[in-house]
C-alpha cells in the first residue's frame, strides 16, 4: 500500500496492469505469432459509462475513508498496545494501496471525486481514533462493522460488472473488455483484503467491545449512508 506523509494525511495510491508472455520450448523451436490487433469491444452505453463512474467515485471515497480510519486507529493504539502495532500497520498499508489504486483510476477515467471528500477525511479519522480511545476491542468492532459493509458493497459491484458488461467484440464474440476485466480483478482482490481485515478484527476480540451492538450497528449505518452519498454527491 505504499508511503504516507503522516497519520493525519494518508498517502495516495498506485495502480498497474501487467501483461505476461508465455514461451513454449520444443526440440525444434517453434514461434507462435500474436495477432497484430486484439478484437475490440463495442463502446459503452451512457448507462454503462455512468455506472463505471459511480463505481470509481464511491470506491475511491470509501478507500480514502478506510485509509483515514486506520490512520486514526494507528495513531491512538500503536504505542499504547505494541502487540497491535504490526496488525494495524498491515491493515493500514493495504488500505493505502487500495486508496492509491482508486486515485489513479479516478484520474485515468477523469471521474469527478465526491464533493464530500473533506467530510469523509474528518469523519473517518474521528471514527478510527474515537473507537480506539474507547478500547482496542472497540477499534476492532469498528473494523468488523466497516469491513462487513464494504465486503457486501464490493460483492454487489462484482455482480453488476458480471451481468451488465457482456459486450460485443469485432470478431463476433461477446464478453467484458480488458478494462472491465482489470477493474473486476482489482475489486475482487480488494474485497478479499477487506474480508481478511474482518477476520482479523474478530480474532482480536471485536465482540468484547462495550457496547458492541451500539458500535457495530451504528457504524454499519454510517457506512451505508456514506456509500449512498458518495455515489451521488
UniProtKB/Swiss-Prot annotation:
It is found in: Mitochondrion inner membrane. The modification Phosphothreonine is found at residue 32. Binds 2 iron ions per subunit. Dephosphorylation by PTC7 leads to activation. Its cofactor is Fe cation. InterPro entries: Ferritin-like_SF, Ubq_synth_Coq7. Keywords: Iron, Membrane, Metal-binding, Mitochondrion, Mitochondrion inner membrane, Monooxygenase, Oxidoreductase, Phosphoprotein, Transit peptide, Ubiquinone biosynthesis. GO terms for cellular component: extrinsic component of mitochondrial inner membrane; mitochondrial inner membrane; mitochondrion. Phosphorylated. Dephosphorylated by PTC7; dephosphorylation is essential for enzyme activation. The modification Phosphoserine is found at residues 20, 28. Belongs to the COQ7 family. Component of a multi-subunit COQ enzyme complex, composed of at least COQ3, COQ4, COQ5, COQ6, COQ7 and COQ9. Catalyzes the hydroxylation of 2-hexaprenyl-3-methyl-6-methoxy-1,4-benzoquinol (DMQH2) during ubiquinone biosynthesis. Also catalyzes the hydroxylation of the 5-methoxy-2-methyl-3-(all-trans-polyprenyl)benzoquinone at the C6 position and participates in the biosynthesis of ubiquinone. Also has a structural role in the COQ enzyme complex, stabilizing COQ3 and COQ4 polypeptides. This is 5-demethoxyubiquinone hydroxylase, mitochondrial. The gene is CAT5.
